[in-house]
Amino acid sequence: HTLTGHCAKVLAAKFLGEPTRVVTGSHDRTLKIWDLRSRACVETKFTGSSCNDLVTSDGSGSTIISGHFDKTIRFWDTRTESGSNDIVLPGKITSLDLSRDANYLLSCVRDDTLKLLDLRMKMIVFTFSAEGFKVGCDWTRAAFSPDGQYVAVGSSDGSIYIWSVTTNKIETILKDHT
């Protein structure tokens, strides 16, 4: 399918609870929800800032979390018109990743940190940083390991930094890309 409707770059797309609905985030400052059967946009949410990444936080597809260039993480309920409970971070958000249990959100931030948020409390519970680690561009991506015990991210120096979520300490720095 080709879906048209955004008027700027689309930087994020995720399935929304079922294989027939997709949500997209764009530099046109909107989120769009698409019905793949009709190939049409069924809802547009105006975010106020360029959306760089998004995740869906429940199996039903009713919650969307979006990360923006205005340093804000926004929470959206697809059953209502507007967002709620925004969290402002100290830099542009370059990526979001959701833990397997959907309790934690990992955000990569242009202030050269990763922030771990507890979604039950809607607050930052830890900040990962390291000497030498630099978020090199607006599209740097961070991710949880499949077991949720580690987080990994690439750095502008070509290294991969891996932290333990339990100890909050650097586990290793892989320099094979340098």
Label the model's feature ranges.
Residues 7, 25-28, 67-70, 108-111, ...:
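Conserved strand-to-loop turn within each blade of WD40 beta-propeller repeats
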